[in-house]
Amino acid sequence: MKIDKLNLDGKKDSIEVLDKIFSAKINKRLVDNVLYKTNANYKGRHAKTKQQNEITGSTSKIYAQKGTGGARHASRKAPIFVGGGVAHGPKGELAYKKRKLNKSEKKLSIASLITEKNKLNNLIIFSDFGNEIKKTKEMHSIIKKFEITNSLIILDKSSKEKIEKSVRNIPNVKVTDINHFSAFDIIKFKKVVFTESSIKELEKRYS
């Protein structure tokens, strides 16, 4: 299929793109599943308390079962004693399994989200950036001109290195390369911006 391509002067052209990425089936259930797994795997479960079986110390009873008049107790490792284990406390990162995210799931979810952006006219493709953008002021004027104030800009690695600094202080705009964006990024921003080179890399990676 063909979609519009713009240059920085605003002139319109077209570019041939893969249907399987830009006109894919929108699978919202799959996207939700990918987001759930990604979010679960991002969580840093650093809090950890010792369970009763992890406490170092004697396992002998603290006093006899009968004859003391007190309640029955086993060892001092019990959660009711100071220095004992913690009942139902956080178990730390190793106790939780990472949810497996298949490559095919990731590819199909990205294709679904890009297709949705395309259908909503929130997908913009530019010709490759040369050395036109060197300052934040220049980048800001381009963002304002093309109404991409809330956008994820996905570039090839060399282009990203050129303009990354010029975008750093502009709010609600993120610049990344083709290897470092996720379904979360696409959903977070209203518009997604590609260049001709990043489209080619995307098609190699996700086709």
From Swiss-Prot:
Q: Which residues cross the membrane?
A: none
UniProt lineage: Bacteria, Pseudomonadati, Pseudomonadota, Alphaproteobacteria, Candidatus Pelagibacterales
- Quaternary assembly: Part of the 50S ribosomal subunit.
Which species is listed as the source?
Answer: Pelagibacter ubique (strain HTCC1062)
- What Gene Ontology molecular function terms does this protein carry? rRNA binding; structural constituent of ribosome
The protein's superkingdom reads: Bacteria
Biological process, per Gene Ontology: translation
- InterPro entries reported for this sequence: Ribosomal_uL4 (IPR002136), Ribosomal_uL4-like (IPR013005), Ribosomal_uL4_dom_sf (IPR023574)
The record's section on Pfam families has:
Ribosomal_L4
Q: What is this protein called?
A: Large ribosomal subunit protein uL4
Ordered alphabetically, the record's keywords are: Ribonucleoprotein, Ribosomal protein, RNA-binding, rRNA-binding
Q: What protein family is recorded?
A: Belongs to the universal ribosomal protein uL4 family.
